[in-house]
Amino acid sequence: MNKVDLIRYQIGMDWSKEIVEDASIEDLDREAIKRARELFSKRQSDRKKAQEVLKKLSDIEVLNKAGITIKGKITRTALLLLGKSESKYYFDGFIPRITWTLYNADNSIKAYEHFDIPMLLAVDKAYSKIRNEKYRYIAGQQTLFPDEVDQYEPELIKEIINNCIAHRDYVLRGKINGEEFEDRRVFIKEEAFIPEIFDQARDPGYKPPYYRNVFLCNAMVNLYM
């Protein structure tokens, strides 16, 4: 499948950059747009000045600047990150989705929940379902009062989910699965990562030969995803 990705890259194809005909800003979720404006403002080096400038701009102008829309036109990235739940039909039967599943000790399913677009809001909703117990420990011999830490760093879990969103092959129409067992948390996207051999990515200075969803990735960076 990576050969297909490479061909797409060589001819300049980017699924996430495609304009969605007939879609408009009315197909985007108001809460997601508001959150996108906040995050994009936070991303600016001069935050105070940026807030003053961005307040004067319309929603579509801010989305243009954030690299989510193109000249006011709605992209697949815009629908994926900010689209209303009822705008799923623009994906032609494919539902961009995160599914959280909680398993019992015998690996039977105890509970599950689906989180659909807008993905900007779905990440936090999915994270809120994941158990992240507090651990107490005493740091050194200078104190008898224990510190409390999360079992998992919240930002690390969100980064994993964001990476699954950014680097999926949406042409294959899969979904993201967050699977929670008693002793581990597993995140699965139904397509191969780039590179398919993980050891290559661990080599110092390694750069993949191509990227998926460059437009989407840049937009997510602008929104602190």
Where are these regions (language model features)?
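Conserved N-terminal catalytic/coupling substructures associated with nucleotide/phosphate chemistry
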Residues: 1-154, 158-225
